[in-house]
Regions:
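Condensing-enzyme catalytic core mediating Claisen C-C bond formation in acyl metabolism
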Residues: 192-296
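A short glycine/serine-rich beta->alpha loop
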Residues: 36-43, 107-109, 134-137, 216-222, ...
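Active-site-proximal alpha-helical scaffold in enzymes
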Residues: 50-63, 116, 120, 134-169, ...
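Glycine-centered flexible beta-alpha turn that most often forms the glycine-rich phosphate-binding loop
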Residues: 300
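Conserved active-site "lid/cap" helical segment
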Residues: 1-81, 147-150, 274-293
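Phosphate/oxyanion-binding active-site loops and adjacent basic polyanion-contact surfaces
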Residues: 42-54, 112-116, 140-144, 224-228, ...
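Short glycine-aspartate micro-motif
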Residues: 78, 161-165, 247, 296
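Active-site-proximal gating segment of KS-fold condensing enzymes and close homologs
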Residues: 5-19, 45, 83-136, 176-177, ...
Length: 311
């Protein structure tokens, strides 16, 4: 939920609010602490969210995991999940890099648990208890799609029958916020107030954090938020045998957003290639008429002026 930054949780040193001046962030619901639901033992925030998110996915599946295990071999499970930027809070790489500078020392867990692919490894080893394939492809905002493509290919090749695809990110740290601020991609308080003035909105209450990110309209930047999401893929025969509720089919995955362009952080022609390939594949599957009348496009929606033209 996008709201004013909770200082005690995310900005104890005052870097984000006092130095950068960015008070809006997408935070977990107030009072919700995923580490209180299991023995977290100094787990980074994104890993805590992984455990909760994967547990929720299994619960929503509605089929006991032991029943699924009876139908497949232990190595027919695959997990593709992770973070795009890294786990940079004090229990991950943040603690690893800051400890000596703050007069302490790193723990034995900072390096290992801070790795971007730890989400997949943790799910495979500790939640599912499987010995199948794990992996993670980092691709900025398209990270989930890259992992989805690997999951699709694993099922199509026959190397896996049950695949978990997901991601977990907890980017509300001073270093990550500062990085997006330096790229002029962040909706900070100064830009928010300027935008509110242009839109003739009330300025007496200060920045309107809930409206900081405004995709597809007059906007000044994005808002960083923490999130965890997982989907479960199965081959057709396994889904039918288990009586699983089927929400959809992944017929194609394309991601060419990092194609030829003038700036690595800006949009490029790859966005159009991605869209064209997916639309062409959809037309093959459902036909031109249904493509035009029965489809839905979920646009990226970063809320940055540079991306507004392609989104």
């Amino acid at each position: 939920m996008v709201r004013k930054l909770e200082i005690d949780l995310y900005d104890q040193d005052g870097v984000i609010l006092d130095q950068i001046g960015a008070s809006a962030a997408g935070q977990l619901p107030k009072g919700f602490d995923p580490s209180s639901l299991y023995p977290a033992r100094q787990h980074p925030k994104a890993l805590q969210m992984t455990v909760f998110g994967m547990g929720d996915a299994l619960g929503q599946l509605g089929i006991d995991w032991k029943k699924i295990q009876e139908k497949i071999a232990p190595d027919e499970v695959a997990v593709f999940s992770g973070a795009a930027i890294g786990q940079l809070d004090s229990f991950g790489f943040g603690g690893l890099m800051q400890s000596r500078l703050k007069g302490s020392r790193a723990s034995s867990k900072n390096l290992a648990l801070g790795l971007v692919e730890m989400s997949a490894d943790f799910i495979n080893a500790y939640i599912l208890g499987s010995v199948g394939r794990t992996g993670h492809v980092v691709g900025a905002c398209a990270t989930f799609l890259y992992n989805l493509q690997m999951g699709k290919e694993a099922i199509e090749s026959g190397s896996a029958r049950f695949v978990v695809v997901g991601g977990s990110e907890a980017p509300i740290t001073p270093e990550i916020v500062d990085g997006f601020y330096a790229m002029s991609a962040l909706s900070d308080d100064k830009r928010m107030m300027e935008m509110q003035a242009q839109q003739n909105e009330n300025l007496s209450d200060g920045p309107h954090q809930e409206k900081a990110c405004r995709p597809f309209g007059q906007n000044v930047g994005m808002v960083l938020g923490e999130s965890s999401q997982f989907i479960i893929l199965m081959d057709d025969s396994l889904a039918i045998e288990l009586g699983a509720e089927v929400y959809g089919c992944v017929s194609a995955v394309s991601s060419h957003s990092d194609g030829f362009k003038s700036s690595i952080s800006g949009p490029g022609v790859g966005n159009y290639i991605t869209m064209a390939k997916c639309v062409a594949e959809a037309e093959k599957t459902i036909g031109s008429k249904k493509l035009r009348t029965r489809t839905f496009v979920h646009a990226h929606g970063t809320g940055t002026p540079a991306n507004r033209t392609t989104e």
